[in-house]
C-alpha cells in the first residue's frame, strides 16, 4: 500500500487499527517447524531434458518453442520429461517457531528408478554460469544424503551435515539450491528434511507440487528416437530450436559435446 493510504487509515481509524494492518505479527505457530517454499524459479542458462516417448515436432511447433510460447523446457517437462544428468531445485526455508529450529539432514529418497529415458532429447547449450549450489545428491548411491558441492566424483564428497547445520529463528529465511544427479539411470524422488524442533525431531517431506522430482542420466546421441538442439548451439542458424537426426552425432555424449549442429 502507498504511504498516502497508510496515513489515511491512521487518521480515520486510529493507531490500533493501523498496527493491525501495517504491522501484523508473524502467522500462527501451528503446523510444521519449517516452512519450505518451492515456488522460486531456478535460473537455467542451459539444460538437457529427455522424454520417455519419441516426439516428432512439426516446423510450426518448433517455431512456437523458439519464441518461448511455451518454453521448450516447460513443454517437455509437462510431457513426462526429466532433466539430465542433474536437476536443480530451489527452496526457501523459513523458521516457524518462537524458538530456533535446526535442519540437521536432507536426503533424496528414491521412489523408483529404471533405465534412462530414450524417447527424445532437448539439448539447450549455454555459455553462461549457474546458480551457486548448496548441496548435491548422488542418486546412484544406495542412500542419497546431502553432500558438499564440488569435485567430479560425488562418492568422494563430504556429507554436508557432518560439518553444517541450518538454524532458523522465527521468520528467518534461507535459500537453498539443491542438485540431484544420476549417471546411470532415471529416478523419481522426494526430499526428506530432518528438523530438530525443541525436544522433538521431525521429518518434513518436499515434492514437486504433488509429484516426485525426476532426473535421468543421458544416453549417447544415437540412442534417442529424436533430437532437438537449442541455446547457443543454434545461434549460427539464427537461434531457436532445430531438429536433427540423432544418428548423425553417433555415440557422442550430449553433456560433453562441443561441435556444431549445422544449419
Indicate where each model-derived feature is located.
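Membrane-aqueous junction of the first/signal-anchor transmembrane helix
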Residues: 1-65
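Short, solvent-exposed beta-strand/turn "edge" segments of beta-rich domains on protein surfaces
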Residues: 73-84, 92-101, 116, 167
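Short, hydrophobic/aromatic beta-strand segments
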Residues: 99-107, 117-120, 147-149, 188-190
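Short acidic, flexible loop segments centered on an aromatic residue
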Residues: 104-113, 150-154, 193-197
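Long, charge-dense
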Residues: 112-154
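Acidic, serine/threonine- and proline-rich intrinsically disordered appendage/tail regions
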Residues: 140-153, 196-263
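Low-complexity, intrinsically disordered segments enriched in Ser/Thr together with acidic residues
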Residues: 155-187
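Ser/Thr/Pro-rich, low-complexity mucin-like regions
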Residues: 179-202
Amino acid at each position: 500500500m502507498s504511504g498516502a493510504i497508510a496515513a489515511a487509515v491512521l487518521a480515520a481509524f486510529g493507531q490500533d487499527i493501523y498496527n493491525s494492518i501495517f504491522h501484523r505479527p508473524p502467522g500462527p505457530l501451528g503446523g510444521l517447524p519449517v516452512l519450505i517454499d518451492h515456488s522460486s524459479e531456478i535460473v537455467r542458462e542451459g539444460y538437457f531434458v529427455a522424454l520417455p516417448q519419441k516426439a516428432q515436432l512439426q516446423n510450426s511447433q518448433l517455431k512456437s518453442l523458439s519464441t518461448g510460447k511455451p518454453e521448450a523446457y516447460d513443454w517437455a517437462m509437462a510431457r513426462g520429461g526429466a532433466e539430465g544428468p542433474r536437476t536443480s531445485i530451489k527452496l526457501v526455508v523459513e523458521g516457524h517457531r518462537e524458538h530456533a529450529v535446526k535442519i540437521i539432514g536432507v536426503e533424496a529418497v528414491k521412489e523408483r528408478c529404471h533405465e534412462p529415458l530414450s524417447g527424445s532429447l532437448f539439448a539447450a547449450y549455454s555459455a553462461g554460469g549457474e546458480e551457486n549450489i548448496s548441496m548435491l545428491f548422488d542418486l546412484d548411491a544406495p542412500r542419497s544424503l546431502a553432500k558438499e558441492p564440488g569435485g567430479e566424483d560425488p562418492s568422494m564428497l563430504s556429507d554436508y551435515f557432518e560439518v553444517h547445520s541450518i538454524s532458523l529463528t522465527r521468520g528467518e529465511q534461507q535459500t537453498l539450491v539443491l542438485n540431484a544427479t544420476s549417471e546411470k539411470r532415471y529416478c523419481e524422488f522426494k526430499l526428506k528434511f530432518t528438523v530438530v524442533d525443541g525436544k522433538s525431531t521431525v521429518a518434513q517431506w518436499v515434492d514437486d507440487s504433488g509429484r516426485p522430482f525426476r532426473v535421468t542420466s543421458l544416453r549417447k546421441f544415437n540412442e534417442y528416437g529424436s533430437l532437438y538442439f537449442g541455446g547457443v548451439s543454434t545461434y549460427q542458424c539464427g537461434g531457436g530450436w532445430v531438429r536433427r537426426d540423432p544418428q548423425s552425432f553417433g555415440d557422442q555424449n550430449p553433456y560433453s559435446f562441443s561441435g556444431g549442429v549445422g544449419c
